Amino acid sequence: MKIDVLFYPEKLKNAEDKAVVVLDVLRATTTIATALAAGAEKIYPVSSIKEAFLLKKKISGALLGGERGGIKVPGFDLGNSPLEYQGLKGKTIILSSTNGTKTLKKAVSARTLIAGSIVNAKAVADYLLKLNLDVVLMPSGTDSQFSLEDFAGAGYIISLLAEQKKIELSDQAYVSFELARSNPPEEILTRSFHGQRLINLGFARDVEYCAKLNLLDVVPEGHLQEGRLVIESSRLFR
């Protein structure tokens, strides 16, 4: 199994035979995993606020969730705090965030598309072992810049893979692996630029939650449905 980690979110090349794991640890992919664990049936990642409102008109009962600059979008039902996503049995979520939902849409060419985070790292690693494909871990970054927490998040998943299978790491994947092996998640997240920004905005509890390694046993898997990306709990994980 070959594993690569990207430094920045970018358009994927030659991913048709690979498993791609998109990470937006603070907070979109953590929120997606949390929403599915709380019973949400489907999550539609969208790039723009306008697209979110238009899609809501087509899906009866859907909830709008997301943020811009870390703050809940006016008119949305939910922000991007994973702590808001509780009691969602059977619900459909339309989610738009500054970074993560856009990166997910860049990865639709993958054979298998997964939303990964620290909270579901082991579930994602176990699923990747079942798939037995080469893997690209794709950090979302912050405003198109390198993101410490996403790069380390990839490393925690790699560490779990390395415990169970012989893996071949690219140079970037090796650096990610060593970063995660040497630093606990809570230290990475609180020291990161984006973590500090969220703490200053009043979301310290979010940062603490997003650092909880292996909290959730859920694998959010994306696929195209009528030309639109939708994320559901993987039916193949069990």
UniProtKB/Swiss-Prot annotation:
Gene Ontology molecular function: any one: magnesium ion binding
Keywords of this entry: Hydrolase, Magnesium
Protein name: Probable 2-phosphosulfolactate phosphatase
Family matches, as PANTHER family: 2-PHOSPHOSULFOLACTATE PHOSPHATASE-RELATED (PTHR37311:SF1)
Family: Belongs to the ComB family.
Catalytic activity as recorded in UniProt: (2R)-O-phospho-3-sulfolactate + H2O = (2R)-3-sulfolactate + phosphate
Cofactors that this protein relies on: Mg(2+)
Record InterPro entries: ComB-like, ComB-like_sf
Species per Swiss-Prot/TrEMBL record: Carboxydothermus hydrogenoformans (strain ATCC BAA-161 / DSM 6008 / Z-2901)
Superkingdom: Bacteria
Leading EC class: hydrolase
Family annotation (Pfam families): 2-ph_phosp
Disulfide bonds: none
SUPFAM superfamilies linked: ComB-like
Lineage: Bacteria, Bacillati, Bacillota, Clostridia, Thermoanaerobacterales
EC number: 3.1.3.71
This protein's record includes keyword Magnesium: yes
